[in-house]
Every structure is written in structure tokens, then in C-alpha cells.
């Protein structure tokens, strides 16, 4: 991998992170926010793999596995919260959470 390939991959990773962050902040639906958060987490994961490939270091792949594991845990917790909030509030809008008591 050359230096220009690394720069292109890092720009792509930053773009994925920015798109995911925008999706989390712009959308009100909890499911859309979870999907956007997954997109945002794929950016740093791509950056770790690209940097590891550039430096011929397997730690980038190890960090990718760590990010992938954390993303899976985030989805599991997020879906459980989504189902609970939808059952209680009857809506998948994240603004409903601020109006809940207890």
C-alpha cells in the first residue's frame, strides 16, 4: 500500500464517520440512529485496517475486531432499548425519551 492509498482510505474513513455522525444528529428515529451509529463506527474500523496494512502491522486488524465487537454489543443493547421504549411509549421517536418519567 502506498502513501496515496493510505490517504484515500483515511479520507474515506473520515467520510464514513462524518456521514454516520450526521445521521445520528439529524434523524429522530431510534432505528435510523442505530444504523447511522454503525456507519460512524465503520469509519474508524476502516482507518485501523488501512493504517495496519500501510505499516504491515497486524494490530490494525486486531483493532478492527475490537471495534466490530463493540459495535455488535452496541447493536444488542440499542435494539433492546428500542424494543422497550417502543413498547412503553408506542413510538420510535427519540424525542419521546425526554418526555418519559421514572
Swiss-Prot record:
Gene3D superfamilies: 1.10.287.3510. GO terms for cellular component: NADH dehydrogenase complex; plasma membrane. InterPro entries: NADH_UbQ_OxRdtase_chain4L/K, NUOK/Mnh_C1-like. Its main location: membrane. It is a multi-pass membrane protein. Disulfide bonds: none annotated. Keywords: Cell inner membrane, Cell membrane, Membrane, NAD, Quinone, Translocase, Transmembrane, Transmembrane helix, Transport, Ubiquinone. It is an enzyme of class 7 (translocase). GO terms for biological process: ATP synthesis coupled electron transport. Its EC number is 7.1.1.-. It holds the Pfam family Oxidored_q2. It is found in: Cell inner membrane. One of its GO terms (molecular function) is NADH:ubiquinone reductase (non-electrogenic) activity. The chain crosses the membrane at residues 6-26, 30-50, 63-83. It catalyses: a quinone + NADH + 5 H(+)(in) = a quinol + NAD(+) + 4 H(+)(out). NDH-1 is composed of 14 different subunits. Subunits NuoA, H, J, K, L, M, N constitute the membrane sector of the complex. NDH-1 shuttles electrons from NADH, via FMN and iron-sulfur (Fe-S) centers, to quinones in the respiratory chain. The immediate electron acceptor for the enzyme in this species is believed to be ubiquinone. Couples the redox reaction to proton translocation (for every two electrons transferred, four hydrogen ions are translocated across the cytoplasmic membrane), and thus conserves the redox energy in a proton gradient. Belongs to the complex I subunit 4L family. This is NADH-quinone oxidoreductase subunit K.
Amino acid at each position: 500500500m502506498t502513501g496515496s492509498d493510505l490517504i484515500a482510505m483515511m479520507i474515506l474513513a473520515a467520510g464514513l464517520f462524518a456521514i454516520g455522525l450526521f445521521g445520528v444528529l439529524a434523524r429522530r428515529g431510534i432505528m435510523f440512529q442505530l444504523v447511522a451509529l454503525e456507519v460512524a463506527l465503520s469509519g474508524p474500523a476502516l482507518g485501523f485496517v488501512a493504517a495496519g496494512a500501510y505499516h504491515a502491522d497486524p494490530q490494525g486488524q486486531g483493532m478492527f475486531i475490537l471495534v466490530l465487537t463493540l459495535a455488535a454489543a452496541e447493536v444488542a443493547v440499542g435494539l433492546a432499548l428500542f424494543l422497550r421504549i417502543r413498547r412503553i411509549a408506542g413510538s420510535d421517536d427519540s424525542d419521546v425519551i425526554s418526555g418519559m418519567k421514572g
